Amino acid sequence: MRDTISVKGARANNLKNISVDLPRDKLVVLTGLSGSGKSSLAFDTIYAEGQRRYVESLSSYARMFLGQMDKPDVDSIDGLSPAISIDQKTTSKNPRSTVGTVTEIYDYLRLLWARCGTPHCPKCGKPIRRQTIDQIVDQIMQLPERTRFQLLAPVVRGKKGEHTKVFDDARRGGYVRVRIDGSIYDLTEEIKLDKNRKHHIEVIVDRLIMKPDLARRLTDSVETASNLSGGLVILNRLDDDSDTMFSQNYACEDCGVSLPELSPRMFSFNNPYGACPVCSGLGTQLVADPSLIIPDDSKSILQGAIQASGFNNVKDDSIARMYFEALAKKYKFSLTDPVRELSKEAMDAILYGTGKENLTIYYERANGRGVLERPFEGVVSNVARRFAETQSEAMHKELEECMAERPCPKCRGDRLSDVSLAVTVGGMNIMQFCRLSVSDALSFMENLQLEGNIAVIAEQILREIKSRLRFLQAVGLRYLTLSRAAATLSGGESQRIRLATQIGSSLMGVLYILDEPSIGLHQRDNDKLLDTLRHLRDLGNTVLVVEHDEDTMRAADYIVDVGPGAGIHGGEIVAAGSLDDIIACPRSVTGQYLSGVKKIPLPAGRRTGNGRTLKICGAAENNLKNLDVEIPLGTFTCVTGVSGSGKSSLVNEILYKKLAGALNRARVRPGKFDRIEGLEFLDKVVGIDQSPIGRTPRSNPATYTGLFNDIRDLFASTSDARTRGYGPGRFSFNTKGGRCEACCGDGLVKIEMHFLADVYVPCEVCGGKRYNRETLEVLYKGRNIADVLDMTAEEALGFFENLPRIRSKIATLVDVGLGYVKLGQSSTTLSGGEAQRVKLATELSRRATGRTIYILDEPTTGLHVADVHKLIEVLQRLVDAGNTVLVIEHNLDVIKVADHIIDLGPEGGEEGGNIVVCGTPEEVAACEASYTGQYLKKLL
């Protein structure tokens, strides 16, 4: 068997026909500058080929469902294993996904509660026993005399299929009728069911009229029905068609409540049998929110205070205006009064309606005037009703802007039905258990006392649950709860959850490819992660990690440094081998930082700010313990703390959302806090995250930064364009006129291959240039518009050196380390770190007011040490201009250059949410209680 994975002639993206041998069954780190080609080698070449070879082995029918698998641009790869990629882009946005379902722990929990749970009555809470035939008969005998009823045996409950055997068995048993999905059918006729739908089938065992001497016949019929269905009997009263379920399995004698047989699906919130009937298992409902309908109560109705769709148009002849004028007349207010000055009675009528009370509405139409008498529904009620009724996706989106998620009133966020929540193991229902943190859940399971047969049944289930919880703890996620929605996890958290799931599967001989697993991890938890990666390797797997973290590099068996620069300056193997080999290579930028030849210097002094502060009072979102936090304005401030300590809750949920609403007029609902002081010292908030700058191939750095408008104006001002009468619109690839119509300005044409992957080929008409021939004939300094879009930022800087307006925007792209990115490069091909730096460059190119606060969440994600160096210089420039920069960060190189640090903790989850220490890096390093301080001490 080969002991290397041998890649020959890789040319994906910017790779320059490289060849490399990676040792198998080892921990291999790929490093290099951002954009140097690491991901192209790891994901677009090695992983893509491993995946493609696996899919090739499947039938063409199976391949049809698996989407496209292009052959990567590489000559050959030998020694490849089946590849599993664990990246950060695949966080589930499905509201039904939770940490428990993603890790599959919840499947084992459902099994445990179904097999070992103690059912209770959902009404009175008493433990429930099974009912005997005599008890069922006694209950039925209490019906009033002459009541007509029938007994049914439920033989199929919510199962797909045609169920012909069920009908044949019933005919052979001498039965005449069945009830299917609520309708009665005669068994003498042929019954055809849709095999793709779920059906309920009940055999009608007997039809009876209640009289005193019925007990004997009733007992026989109940027994027959119970035997047919495995213990269930349905009593159907013919006078009101109501059903009562009896179970030989579980029932409460006091309340008459019967429970079905416990089964795993009863505990699934994705199954109608277990889900809460009101919210269908989501745990939340969208409710019209007055604070989003009226985001700014200092405005009057005529100034547009009411922002709900349908009520935001208050022109003279609008229906909304007529209603508001009638309300103003009735409740004696003016439409020019600020909304906050209206009486409670008037506000209630505007928001919740006038009930049955009529308003007198005067209207004018082309055919004359008129008067209407009718009640007003209220804005909140109107939004809620239209949201429930509309079938239009666009309308849903528009109305959603005025709605907020609230816990479901029936299950209070627990997602399951009353019956499912009434079953306990160790005194807890399944959702109470899921709300425990991973570490608490593990200790609950380790101390769970079960007796007799139940202990034997539970043994294997408990072993699986405990091992999976231990793996989650091992990758630094002890603070998460199993009920946490997967969509709320950060990229790093979701990646580590999938890592824990993979360890749980205990595969060997697999190639695992990971993309920066240390993201979002505090230095303290990094050692646990490295132990996990070593464990995965020791099982007999090859672990290939794309990483910039120094600790991971020092722990690796083999390092490959891709570079030497980024983009066109990268794509080569600079060095490969042990840590010492990388340090010894003079061309390796990574080696220079590892050896200490290059390093990020400490600043000469710390800024104290401009004397003003932004103060958050009473922050209590998620695990925050009612904090009062001060941020000095005019400084570079870092918020630090272990994973789950409350950094994102404080900065993103409370501060950013409040500032965005107050300064940028955004309609968002901030987290829980009392008040924020010091807003008057700011005029703008800018949140710079790693989300894509555009989701279509048409979006690119030139369009995002606003540079493309200037370039189009420049081409439109050339003598050639003026002679032809071309305006700036002629040079847009999004509108008809100048673009190539064969590919609609995309430059690529999609060819559907049905059984094979769709193929994208350059457009034959324009050759991938996006524009038609006439547009491309207009030149500036010998280049056409397509040539300019194909330039890297570095090339463009020299090309436009005499045009300060354009040059300054391009210079900021180069300053943030994106000199290698092409101006027209599709935004879908940019990494998260690159997208973030495009946003930073856009902000840098704007005129600074000195009163802006910039909020960044882990800006060093995806950045090499050399890029972090550049990023810090850019952030310091923003602060030097008088602005405030607030960063959530784990990277010690960024933390050590900050002016002020707010360290949260001390732990994650419930044990976090407090301020451990605030002050300069030196003050934080002196604090014994701060984990951040202990690691920072070594760098100062």
Write out the residue ranges for each language-model feature.
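Conserved phosphate-binding elements of NTP-dependent enzyme cores
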Residues: M1-L940
